[in-house]
Amino acid sequence: DWVYAKDTYDAFSKQHPELLPPGITDPQIALFETPLGEIVRLFSFILKGDARGAMNCVKILTRIDDVRELVEQKSPQAKYLYKRFKEVNREYQSLLKSGCAAAKKQDSLLLFSYTDDTISLTSDLSNELLHRFPDKTIIVCREKSGEMKCSLRSATLLLPPLVQQSLAGLEGYGGGHEHACGSVVKTHNFDEFIRRIRKQI
C-alpha cells in the first residue's frame, strides 16, 4: 500500500533536501531511512494516548509555521511536541527491538504481541517490521481487555481473504487493504486464528 507520488516527492525534496534527499523513489526508504521519517512518526505518535492529550497536540501543531521550526525545535510549541514524541518513541523503539528479535530465520511468519492498555503502536510497528523483513508476513498484536488487536502486513499476500477465512467461526472481525489489514479476535480464539493463518502462508 505504499504510494510514490513523483511530483510531490520532487517538490518536497527540492524545498527540504535535508529531510528527503533527492533521488529517493521508494516510499519505504523515505519513511524509514531518511530524516523525514522521524517527522512522519512524530505526527503519528503525538496522536497516541488519550483524546484530550492528542487534541492538545493538534492545537499546538496548528501554531507551527514551518517544518524547520519543528525539526530544529525553535519554539516552545515545537519543543513540547518533540517532548511528547520522545516519550512515545522510547516505548516504540523498545517494542521494535523486541519485534525484530521475534523474527525467526526459517519462519515465514513474524508474530509479535505485547500488552498495553493505553497506546496502540501495532500499525506503526507492523509497517517498519515489514520494511525490515519484506519476505515475511507480519502480525503485531496488542492484548487489551480480553482481545488481541492485530495489524497484519505482507508484501505479496492478499490479506483480506486470508483474514476472513482465518476468522470464520471465531469471535472476531477484520479487514482492510490488500497488503495491510487489521483484525480483532478474542484471546481464547487467538491461537486458532494464528494456526489458520499459518496454513495459508
Segments and roles (model prediction):
Residues 1-105, 115-116, 132:
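A structured phosphate/pyrophosphate-recognition subdomain
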Residues 11-18, 108-201:
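Glycine-rich, acidic loop segments that terminate in or are immediately followed by a histidine
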